[in-house]
Design a protein with these regions (language model features):
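Membrane-interface "cap" regions at the ends of multi-pass membrane proteins
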Residues: 1-69, 76, 93-98, 120-122
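Helix-loop interface residues and adjacent transmembrane-helix termini in multi-pass membrane transporters
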Residues: 67, 76-80, 190, 262-265, ...
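Membrane-interfacial loop- and helix-cap regions that link adjacent transmembrane helices
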Residues: 46-47, 102-145, 149, 154-176, ...
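Hydrophobic alpha-helical transmembrane segments
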Residues: 73, 186-191, 368-374
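Extracellular loop-to-transmembrane helix junctions
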Residues: 71-115, 119
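Loop-to-helix transition at the N-terminal end of transmembrane alpha-helices
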Residues: 77-91, 204, 275, 383-388
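Central hydrophobic cores of alpha-helical transmembrane segments in multi-pass inner-membrane proteins
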Residues: 65, 90-102, 181-189
Length: 477
């Protein structure tokens, strides 16, 4: 037997032996040891736990409705700053997603040494913080994470009402939001992230079409007569736009749930980075092209589809984004379903219909808030500055620093520093930089600018706005 064959055999054997009992149980539950046609079809469409499934889930979740609001951010920042912040926050987000994955693996390894059984239990971020750092960190993680996911779901619902209006203005945006709120309630029927295999694949295809449709259409359309590119105009717009981009690459609030759905969670480490690199190939060309074509007009249109010419290609983009909104709503809301199941004591129940019925109350407040604050675009920045900053940037960095603060913890860490960081000291320095940067620029300046802009939207359109930024004045109030 050749050297390559021996290496392959050793690697294969090592991977098989490294499965925990929980992962073996999951393989049996998913039918991965059953080779019948029914089981194979189920595996292909429904049961996803590979690295590729995780990549599709991360990329699909990351590039949702923000694709339509990034041109608005470019009209606040300008092209140079817009591209710079996308690359910068994309890399920063990939780093903190890596930290979250390290903390998850560390938590799970410690708990399994204590013979804790996670069968029929989905591990969540606040539980990782509780196990590694105690109840106060659990409370912080729970508060920020759940609040962010709540508003993340609200944003997806607002996007549904905003998008469908550009196909049919028979109803105002508020009415469409109410209708789609009822439709999004069907996401209670998806058990976990494990079951988003085909949906993540289709969702990413939908956003890929929309991104390139926006890019090509804007370039073919050319510059509007008299178009102006005056961004950045003032500090409020500048930091609002920057914070929306921070929000764009802060979609890893569901990282732990996606990892837990994997058969080999330890392989997640670089998944988010590669998903971010793909997302950048969609967001940078589309936002740049649309801003180049329409310029400052985007300041009055949070949804880029409002300015693109109405034709069958735009209608297809709207329909595809609507379908993707359902998927992304499920991504944001499913962790909240898990939390609610745990609160009322049905999370480990083998009767899924009972769990699905128990999830319904979670959608009600989301539905209501989407009607109160329909500010598509500005709400992203507000959520980014006040919630995403802590949930997916500051807390993971601080938690990683505290978890491995002792020499003993560092020596016994499941995941050592990556090759790009030569030592633990380098990891600590970079984590400290992320915390300071995000707190000062994201929470401080971003929070100030986003709040000013959000209050301006309320004063201009009012809460419960019937048709936010509609061209038809009869729908505005």
């Amino acid at each position: 037997m050749g050297l390559q064959s021996l290496v392959a055999l050793a690697t294969h054997t090592g991977e098989n032996n490294s499965y925990t009992e929980v992962e073996k149980d999951r393989q049996e539950q998913d039918g991965l040891v059953d080779n019948s046609m029914r089981a194979l079809a189920k595996k292909f469409l429904w049961h996803g736990g590979s690295v590729y499934d995780a990549w599709f889930s991360c990329a699909s979740n990351q590039v949702a409705q923000v694709l339509l609001t990034l041109p608005y951010s470019f009209s606040q920042l300008g092209i140079v700053w817009g591209v710079t912040f996308q690359v910068f926050y994309g890399l920063l987000g990939s780093w903190t997603a890596y930290l979250i994955s390290c903390l998850y693996v560390e938590y799970r390894a410690r708990k399994e040494k204590e013979n804790v059984n996670f069968k029929n239990h989905v591990i969540q971020w606040f539980e990782v913080l509780d196990g590694l750092l105690g109840p106060y960190w659990k409370a912080a993680g729970f508060t920020f994470n759940c609040t962010f996911l709540l508003f993340g779901s609200v944003i997806q619902l607002i996007a549904c009402g905003s998008n469908i209006y550009y196909i049919s203005d028979r109803f105002d945006k508020r009415t469409w939001t109410i209708i789609f709120g009822a439709c999004c309630m069907t996401t209670v029927l998806v058990p976990s992230f494990h079951n988003y295999r085909i949906w993540s694949f289709l969702g990413l295809g939908m956003t890929t079409y929309t991104a390139w449709y926006m890019t090509i259409t804007a370039l073919v359309h050319g510059k509007d007569p008299g178009v102006k590119h005056s961004a950045p105009n003032n500090l409020v717009q500048y930091f609002t736009g920057a914070t929306n981009i921070l929000y764009t690459f802060g979609g890893h609030a569901v990282t732990v749930e996606i990892m837990h759905a994997m058969w080999k969670p330890s392989k997640f480490k670089s998944v988010y980075l590669f998903s971010t690199l793909y997302v950048l190939t969609l967001t940078i060309p589309s936002a740049t092209a649309v801003y180049w074509a329409f310029g400052d007009e985007l300041l009055h249109n949070g949804n880029a589809l409002a300015l693109l010419p109405k034709n069958v290609f735009r209608d297809l983009a709207v329909v595809l984004m609507l379908l993707h909104q359902f998927i992304t709503f499920g991504f944001a809301c499913t962790p909240l379903y898990f939390v609610w199941e745990k609160i009322i004591g049905v999370h480990r129940s083998p009767r899924f219909l009972l769990r699905a019925a128990a999830r319904i109350p979670v959608v009600i407040p989301i539905w209501f808030m989407a009607v109160i604050f329909p500010f598509f675009g500005p709400i992203n920045s507000a959520v980014g500055s006040l919630l995403v900053t802590f949930t997916v940037y500051i807390i993971p960095c601080l938690a990683h620093m505290l978890t491995f603060r002792t020499a003993f913890a560092r020596e016994n860490a499941v995941e050592k520093p990556p090759f790009i960081m030569p030592s633990w000291a380098a990891v600590y320095v970079f984590n400290f930089f992320v915390v300071v940067w995000v707190f000062v620029v994201g929470v401080g300046f971003g929070g100030w600018a986003s709040t000013v802009n959000f209050v301006h939207q309320i004063k201009t359109f009012g809460i419960f706005a019937k048709c936010y930024q509609c061209p038809n004045n009869s729908h505005r109030h």
